[in-house]
Structure formats: C-alpha cells, structure tokens
C-alpha cells in the first residue's frame, strides 16, 4: 500500500469539502442564522486544516494501483461523512454522533434515509447542507476531484473504476480527466434545467434548489415532513421526469450532444430501463386505481413512486405503504433493479440484470446443445469473460452482505418487512422502506449498532461493495 499517496489524496478531498462547507454558511448568513453560520465556518476551517496537513505528506513513489484506488475511495467517503456530520452535532439538530453520521452518510451516498421525525423546523443552513450532500455525492466526490487535478499514470482510471457505478467504466473521450469534466458538465446542466422548471411552477428559489440537488443526486432528503405530497401535480410531474432522466446512463447524453441519436437510442440498457418503468407504472396504476378519484391521479402517483424507487431517489408523493400488496411488491422489486450504470442512481443496476439474463440464456442453450458456441453480447459488442465474472462476484458479494446485514439488524426485534426493506433501502441507496421505515416514517428507532450496520450498507451500496470490503483484507494494508 502506498500510504503517502492515499493520504495526500484524502488531503485534496478534505480541502474541497472545506470549500463546499462555505455554501451552507452563506445560506445561514442570508437567513440570519448566526450560530449555524459559525458552526459551518468552524467545520470548514477544520476540514481545510486537515486537508492542508495531509497535503504536506510527500509520496516517494507515485505508483497508484487498484489497491490504492479502492482504499482511497472508501476512506474518502468515510472521511467526508465524519467531517460532514459535525454541523449536525454542533448545532444541536442531531446531538447523537451516530445519528448525525447516519444522516450525513445517507446524504453523501444519496440514500435519503433519515433518523429525523420532522425536518420543517430545521435551520435553512442545515436543510441546505442535507440536500447539498446529495448533489456532491451524486456524481461522486472522486469524479469531481478527477475533473480538477492532473493525476499521473493510471491513477485516473483506478480511481474512477473504484467509485463509478456499474459493471464497467466507459471513457467518453481518451483522457479520463476530460471524461470527468464532461460528466459534471452534463450533471450541472440537467440540475439547472430542472431548477428552472420548478421555478416556473411557482416553487420558491430555496425549495427549487433543494429539490434539484436531491433529484440530481437521486437522493431522497425532503424539506417537508410529507416529502412531495403537498406539492402541485405540475411539481410532482417535473420531479418524476427528472428523477427518471438522472437514472439514465450519462454516456447516452454525451452521444446526444454529439448528435449520435441512433447509437444513444440503441442502448439495450436504456431501452430495458424505460421498458421496466412503463411496465411497472402500468401495473401499479391499475392496482391502485380504486384508491384515487381519477385515473390521472393514480397514474401520477404510480409514475412518481416508480421513478423514485427505480432511480433510488426515495422521494414520496403519497404514503405508498398504504397501497395494495401487489403495488408494494413491485416497488420492492424495483429497489433491487436500480437505475442504469453510469447514472447517479443506485441499486444492482439494469445492465447487470441484462448480463445475468443473457448469461443464463447462454447456459441454457449450452445445456441443450453442448457443442454450440453462444457468446454474450451487449449493444452488439462481445462481453468479455472478465466482465461476466466480475458481475457474478458482485452479485455473490451483494447477497452475502444483504444476508449478514439482515441478521444483524434483526437483533433489534422489528418485524421481518421492516428489517428486510431497511437493508434493501440502505444497500440499494433508496431511502424509505416499508412498515416502521415507510415513506412517512424514519430510521430513528433502530439502535446505534443497527444504524452502524446500515451506515456500512449505504457506503457499500454507493461504492459497489468492493471498496468497503477490501478494507477488511490484510493484503490491502501491506506496504510494497
């Protein structure tokens, strides 16, 4: 392990977080929240000082392999979450450090699971920081770093592979740093467009900003106790559309910018993603029709919740825990499917399910006809065995972690549905589950131990499991 270069990278991350913490301080200044502003300024100073201290470490070697990539990724997310939790504790909004860490990790990992029973009484600076963590974490803190810093050798690729969602990383252009800039450019542009549409619908500037942060990062922190239930149908439709758009592989947007419309539309993953959404909306709309006055209202709530769950955003337009069993079962299944690879969404990812389906088809063919060569293809390209192997290992690790987490949180004594959906909601970065952790409930009743398990799940889900698991391997920490 090249400790020096990992710590130096952590220094960059903490310096960036120190700068970002100034934005909620400015928000507190605007709303004359002087004590809250002081807390954010203090936290920003601590983060910047920590970053400057780590930056003084000079690595003797600039070699940066996947081991360093995994460790730097996991440690970076842990570090920004610990520092990001400080304002919650010092302002007294969340005095319990474990609860504050849970809330912050939930923000950065774009999970949106909360321990707060009510949010409308929180200072505006804290509300801004909660939602802003979604936007920071949506595209990835290291992707942001890559867009700014000229790292050497294969460092760019190893960092992006360690943090990026999906079975493989596609470079949009030859230079990874340029790819990171393009991704953030698209991310920022879509956020601004949604912000403008929300303003046009009568939502005020502050609420529009928080909503755009949450939607862009596919996080689920609301600033109203009932999430989006009290907003107009126009606002709900705008949020629905943009949740779905942020769940699309960003490579497709890059192709659209290049006017390669046919290639963008031919993506098997994107087509499957929209197909799943349409099918789920149709099934749920029919199933919940009797609960609402008009077909249009049922369609709106079905589309909102399907978009929210499959993209792992976690916003709510109603209490879907009161829906019929079939509708809730469809939503739970969507929790596992997730959004597209290369998007800001979580879950297992549509591309992995496509690969699993194609691999299963290949195995069935060869079981019937052993001599037949049946290659697996995605978008007309041959999928190599390494990608298939990595996908299978990921699914195995996912099942193991899900089962272990379920057993551990069950020690708190809650019912099976609550525990199962709690793990599903955190490991897939969804936010709300069912029963005691439903859309109008929260995770506050869990013990500190269970919350720490769920914190690990949120980080593991956002980082595609492997970076968090390798922290437990002795080989990770051996010097070379």
Tell me what each language-model feature is.
Residues 1-480:
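Membrane-proximal intracellular helices of multi-pass ion channels
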């Amino acid at each position: 392990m090249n400790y020096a270069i990992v710590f130096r990278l952590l220094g960059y991350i903490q310096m960036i977080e120190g700068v970002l913490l100034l934005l909620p301080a400015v928000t507190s200044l605007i709303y004359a929240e002087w004590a809250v502003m002081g807390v954010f300024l203090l936290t920003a100073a601590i983060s910047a000082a920590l970053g400057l201290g780590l930056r003084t470490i000079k690595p003797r070697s600039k070699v940066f392999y996947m081991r360093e990539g995994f460790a730097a990724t996991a440690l970076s997310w842990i570090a920004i979450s610990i520092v990001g939790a400080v304002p919650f504790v010092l302002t007294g909004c969340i005095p319990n450090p474990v609860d504050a860490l849970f809330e912050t990790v939930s923000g950065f990992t774009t999970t949106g699971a909360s321990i707060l029973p009510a949010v409308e009484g929180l200072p505006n600076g804290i509300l801004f920081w909660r939602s802003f963590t979604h936007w920071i974490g949506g595209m990835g803190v290291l992707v942001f770093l890559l867009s700014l810093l000229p790292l050497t050798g294969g460092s760019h690729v190893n960092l992006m592979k360690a943090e990026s969602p999906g079975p493989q990383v596609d470079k949009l252009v030859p230079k990874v740093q340029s790819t990171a800039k393009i991704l953030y450019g698209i991310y920022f542009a879509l956020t601004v467009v949604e912000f403008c549409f929300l303003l046009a619908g009568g939502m005020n500037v502050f609420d529009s900003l928080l909503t755009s942060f949450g939607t862009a990062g596919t996080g689920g922190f609301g600033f109203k106790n009932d999430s989006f239930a009290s907003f107009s149908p126009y606002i709900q439709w705008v949020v629905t559309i943009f949740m779905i758009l942020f769940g699309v592989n960003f490579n497709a947007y890059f192709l659209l910018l290049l006017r390669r419309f046919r290639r963008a539309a031919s993506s098997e993953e994107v087509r499957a993603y929209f197909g799943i959404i349409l099918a789920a909306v149709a099934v749920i709309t029919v199933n919940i029709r009797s609960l609402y006055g008009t077909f249009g209202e049922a369609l709106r709530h079905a589309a909102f919740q399907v978009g929210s769950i499959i993209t792992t955003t976690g916003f709510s337009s109603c209490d879907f825990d009161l829906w019929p069993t079939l509708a809730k079962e469809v939503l739970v299944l969507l929790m596992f499917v997730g959004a597209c690879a290369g998007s800001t969404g979580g879950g297992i990812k549509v591309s992995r399910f496509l690969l699993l389906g194609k691999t299963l088809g290949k195995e069935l063919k060869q079981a019937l006809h052993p001599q037949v060569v049946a290659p697996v293809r995605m978008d007309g390209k041959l999928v190599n065995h390494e990608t298939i192997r990595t996908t299978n290992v990921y699914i195995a690790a996912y099942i193991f972690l899900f089962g272990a987490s379920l057993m551990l949180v069950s020690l708190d004594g809650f019912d099976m549905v609550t525990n199962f959906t709690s793990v599903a909601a955190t490991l897939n970065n969804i936010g709300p589950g069912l029963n005691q952790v439903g859309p109008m409930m929260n995770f506050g009743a869990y013990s500190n131990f269970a919350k720490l398990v769920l914190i690990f799940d949120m980080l593991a889900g956002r980082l595609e499991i492997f970076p968090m698991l390798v922290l437990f391997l002795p080989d990770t920490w051996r010097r070379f």
